Amino acid sequence: MTQVKPKEVDEISLQLVVGLGNPGPQYANTRHNCGFMVVDRLAQRWGIPLVLEKRFQGSYGEGFALGGKRRLLKPETYMNRSGQSVRAVLDWYKLDLASVLVVYDDMDLPLGRLRLRGSGSAGGHNGMKSIIQHLGSEAFPRLRLGVGKPKGSQDVVGHVLGGFAPAEQEVLERVLDVAVEAVECCWQEGLRTAMNRFNPLDLSGPSSDLDGSNPAPGHGEASS
């Protein structure tokens, strides 16, 4: 893998938000599709239609919002080949790696937590593995949304391709709303400010504070 020195977070100017997931209605509300959910909310909020683009192997849209041009992408390749779609968009528009923000689910974070970073490894996520492989670098921003680990005897694939329990749905809605705010903060105020503002939040409780006053303590076939 080509080693590219990550840019400082203050240098990053976002051009594209990528949400990861699996295509098809049977996967629409699964844990593994949290990235799709965020991009869908951004598209609705910004009035940007998402259209299937064969050249990008994904649903793509662009328009003006927050005072500038915004691009959104949902790879339709299934999770394990997400990098093909992201690479195609970067090549077509000549975008810098550091201008891409990837949104995806993360089992290492509990439901109710989210985490912004300027770079990093795939952490076992197959969609991120594919993107890192196709981009040849880990030096791009990402927003991880916690979905928690499997409970009891449930396996990993069953967990990430499973839906949210009714008791989890309220927390999920809060997380998705705050994820949209975090993306907009990245665009308007920069990644460093967004990291400081949103990474400490714990949205898991019924009275979770969204202002930071309640911080947390110090997969062709549907693919996982």
UniProtKB/Swiss-Prot annotation:
GO terms for biological process: protein quality control for misfolded or incompletely synthesized proteins; rescue of stalled ribosome. It comes from the Bacteria. Its EC number is 3.1.1.29. GO terms for molecular function: peptidyl-tRNA hydrolase activity; tRNA binding. The record marks 105 as: Stabilizes the basic form of H active site to accept a proton. The active site is at residue 32. Residues 203-215 have a biased composition (Low complexity). HAMAP family: Pept_tRNA_hydro_bact. This is Peptidyl-tRNA hydrolase. It comes from Synechococcus sp. (strain JA-2-3B'a(2-13)) (Cyanobacteria bacterium Yellowstone B-Prime). The lineage of its organism: Bacteria, Bacillati, Cyanobacteriota, Cyanophyceae, Synechococcales. The gene is pth.
